[in-house]
A protein has these predicted regions:
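A structural motif detector for beta-strand N-caps
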Residues: 232-235, 239-240, 244-253, 257, ...
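Residues at the starts of beta-strands that form the adenosine-phosphate
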Residues: 2, 47-49, 75, 128-129, ...
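N-terminal glycine-rich phosphate-binding loop and ensuing alpha1 helix
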Residues: 1-60
Length: 293
């Protein structure tokens, strides 16, 4: 099995932070989310990984080259896009990479899902595409539960499910992909033509799309407060994590915080539900539910 990480998006829901850092490099407890994904794939025994790039691609490419040097057993093939091609276009642009069944994962997904379960299900499904679904925040995927068959997308219903951003495909299906289209639209067209798209329903694992600030902060809260275990992240026994010594007088930490190294905090400051990045400078004041850089 091989894997492909979709990572070319502009991250508009994370502005203004994505003006300086591409979404795949957003740190979770100090570790880029794409590094967490790469480590998960490595621990699964996957040694060939493809990834597409567009927004602030030089920063992402430099990180990937550094990761590969540290992990020479992993081969990373980078597919640069001169313009955004959509998720379907990204697959077509890298079609020569897809020689066998491939695990595809969005680069903004934080999860502790056991990918091996998807692999075994895929091989028994006789379906060219299997999408991992759960009961989540955006329940717009309609599924025939009896046959694990997806019926439609983008219809909000109470009984519907949320796509986790994790799927597996047979490369033979790529010949049906039109250029520059979203994968969801492509799959709906395939369903309309009678091609089965299967659902792997998983409600016992953690999935968080960190593609907006609310969810980015919530992911930290889930790990620090609810003690959700992501094996590829550092475990902290307490919800107040302060890694800097540059702290003024009368600084108060509440609820949970993750304060990175080299952060400077002025005196008379209160921080609650806050994540800082390295070298952040925090002026005196009260901060709650914010990312400070």
């Amino acid at each position: 099995m091989q894997a492909f990480i979709l990572s070319a998006g502009k991250g508009t829901r994370l502005l203004p932070y994505t003006k300086i850092l591409p979404k795949p490099l957003f740190p979770i407890l100090g570790k880029p989310v794409v590094e967490i994904i790469l480590d998960q794939l490595k621990n699964l025994g996957i040694t060939l990984i493809g990834i597409n790039t567009f927004h602030l691609k030089d920063k992402l490419i430099n990180f990937l080259k550094s990761y590969q040097k540290k992990n020479p057993q992993i081969k990373i093939r980078i597919f640069e896009e001169k313009e955004l091609m959509g998720t379907g276009g990204a697959i077509i642009n890298a079609k020569n990479f897809f020689k066998e069944e491939t695990l595809i994962i969005n680069s903004d997904i934080l999860t502790n899902f056991n990918f091996e379960k998807l692999y075994y299900f895929f091989n028994q499904s006789f379906s060219p595409v299997v999408m991992v679904l759960h009961k989540g925040e955006n329940n717009n995927v309609e599924v025939d539960i009896n046959s694990n068959t997806i019926i439609s997308f983008r219809k909000q219903k109470e009984d519907n499910l949320t796509f986790t951003g994790i799927q597996m495909i047979d490369p033979k299906i790529i010949k049906y992909f039109p250029f520059k289209k979203d994968l969801i639209d492509i799959y709906q067209n395939l369903i309309n033509k009678g091609i089965k798209i299967s659902a792997f329903i998983e409600n016992n694992s953690y999935f968080k799309d960190i593609g907006n600030i609310k969810n980015y902060l919530k992911a930290h809260e889930d790990i620090l407060i609810k003690k959700i275990k992501i094996p590829e992240t550092t475990f902290y026994s307490k919800p107040i994590v302060v890694k800097t010594k540059n702290i003024g007088n009368n600084v108060i930490f509440k609820d949970w915080v993750y304060i990175e190294e080299d952060t400077f905090i002025e005196a008379n400051t209160q921080l609650s539900k806050v994540v800082t990045w390295k070298r952040a400078y925090i002026k005196s004041g009260i901060y709650e539910s914010q990312v400070l850089i």
